[in-house]
């Protein structure tokens, strides 16, 4: 079958015929999503990526159609595979939560230990499949990254139970959250935080482009240019830009006492200057800093439900989510979009 192949730790990408055997029901892949992790692997920038027998099938975002009945699913169902699998040894993995793997030996589809989903067919166990409602067929590919954010917000709220965090009226309306980064992840974080009732701010080191302005207007989120001085403080900050450690150094002091700082993704450049004064500020203000990564099956189901809700609540934004569709037969364009993000991009899909 045809597949998109990489050879980590080296750079480069190609479309090749491969023979990969698998267990479980067959799934015909209809489309894949492209994210920053895929591009880091293609460009040889992700040290965690590993080859299997000399190559690796790329991709951890996929939508497919089930080709046979299972215990709980039926032939013809739209399904999405979970991208992280357990090590099989630690307690969390054995209890279905490999997002908290204790050995660090979890498998990541299209990244390490497991071939990815950018291929014509896969076979997979039913327990790793999530049924996709037909009503969100056009934007369902967003559920995989959104699942990671569902888990992230769940984690933030759980951690902040260390104090009384809800407002006097029982909502989160009085809690201000700043998101750094206006890409796919930043926008999805903004939508999710608005759904939870937070007062949401989103930021970048520039002014918003036209598409971003339309989205932020519909979401009723406020915009901050990080190149300018920011005189406000926030109850939580989510770093979703992955641009450099200077963003963390710039925004961490903006947290209020008892604040939460979540880091999603990987900073590409820089060194964080942890002076004694910097660390004292974290201690005296009782700041919590948490790395945010990977949602599991319950979070993907939550993501599906939120996408259904948002098609009604935020119709303009959801209609702009898919920036481009690229056919697997257009190899030249495929290599371009797998290597570099285009300006104004939210999500690009590969169509099989």
Curated annotation (Swiss-Prot):
Q: Which cofactors does this protein require?
A: Zn(2+)
Which keywords does this chain's UniProt record carry?
Carbohydrate metabolism, Metal-binding, NAD, NADP, Nucleotide-binding, Oxidoreductase, Zinc
Any one Gene Ontology MF annotation carried by this entry is: glucose 1-dehydrogenase (NADP+) activity
Write out the GO biological process terms. Answer: non-phosphorylated glucose catabolic process; protein tetramerization
Sorted alphabetically, which SUPFAM superfamilies does this protein's record hold?
GroES-like, NAD(P)-binding Rossmann-fold domains
- Top-rank taxon, per record: Archaea
> What EC designation does it have?
1.1.1.47
Record-listed substrate binding positions: 37, 83, 108, 144, 148, 294
| Residues at which Zn(2+) 2 binds | 87, 90, 93, 101
- Where do the annotations place Zn(2+) 1 binding? 35, 60-61, 144
The entry's NADP(+)-binding residues are 182-185, 204-206, 264-266, 292-294, 341
Keyword NAD in annotation: yes
Could you tell me what reaction this enzyme catalyses? D-glucose + NAD(+) = D-glucono-1,5-lactone + NADH + H(+); D-glucose + NADP(+) = D-glucono-1,5-lactone + NADPH + H(+)
The disulfides recorded in the entry are none
Q: Does the keyword Oxidoreductase apply?
A: yes
Job description of the protein: Catalyzes the NAD(P)(+)-dependent oxidation of D-glucose to D-gluconate via gluconolactone. Can utilize both NAD(+) and NADP(+) as electron acceptor. Is involved in the degradation of glucose through a non-phosphorylative variant of the Entner-Doudoroff pathway.
What is the protein named? Glucose 1-dehydrogenase 1
């Amino acid at each position: 079958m045809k597949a998109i192949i990489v050879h980590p730790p080296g750079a480069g990408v190609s479309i090749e015929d491969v023979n990969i055997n698998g267990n479980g029901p067959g799934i015909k892949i209809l489309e894949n999503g492209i994210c920053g992790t895929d591009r880091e692997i293609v460009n040889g920038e992700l040290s965690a990526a590993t080859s299997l027998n000399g190559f690796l099938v790329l991709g951890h975002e996929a939508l497919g159609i089930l080709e046979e009945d299972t215990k709980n699913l039926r032939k013809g169902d739209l399904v999405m595979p979970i991208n992280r699998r357990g090590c099989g040894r630690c307690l969390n993995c054995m209890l279905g939560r490999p997002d908290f793997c204790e050995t660090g030996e979890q498998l990541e589809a299209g990244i390490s230990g497991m071939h990815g989903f950018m291929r014509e067919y896969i076979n997979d166990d039913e327990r790793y499949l999530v049924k996709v409602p037909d009503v969100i067929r056009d934007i369902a590919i967003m559920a995989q990254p959104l699942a990671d954010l569902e888990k992230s917000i769940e984690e933030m709220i759980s951690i902040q139970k260390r104090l009384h965090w809800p407002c006097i009226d029982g909502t989160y309306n009085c809690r201000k959250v700043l998101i750094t980064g206006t890409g796919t992840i930043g926008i999805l974080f903004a939508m999710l935080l608005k759904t939870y009732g937070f007062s949401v701010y989103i930021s970048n080191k520039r002014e918003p482009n036209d598409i971003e302005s339309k989205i932020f207007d519909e979401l009723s989120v406020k915009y901050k240019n990080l190149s300018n001085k920011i005189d406000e403080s926030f109850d939580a900050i989510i770093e979703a830009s992955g641009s450099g450690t200077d963003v963390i150094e710039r925004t961490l002091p903006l947290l209020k006492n008892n604040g939460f700082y979540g880091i999603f993704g990987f900073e590409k450049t820089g060194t964080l200057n942890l002076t004694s004064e910097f660390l004292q500020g974290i201690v005296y203000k009782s700041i919590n800093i948490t790395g945010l990564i990977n949602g599991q099956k319950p979070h993907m189901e939550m993501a599906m439900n939120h996408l259904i809700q948002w098609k009604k609540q935020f119709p303009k934004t959801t209609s702009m989510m898919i920036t481009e569709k690229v056919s697997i037969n257009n190899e030249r364009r495929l290599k371009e979009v797998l290597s570099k993000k285009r300006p104004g991009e939210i999500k690009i899909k590969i169509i099989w």
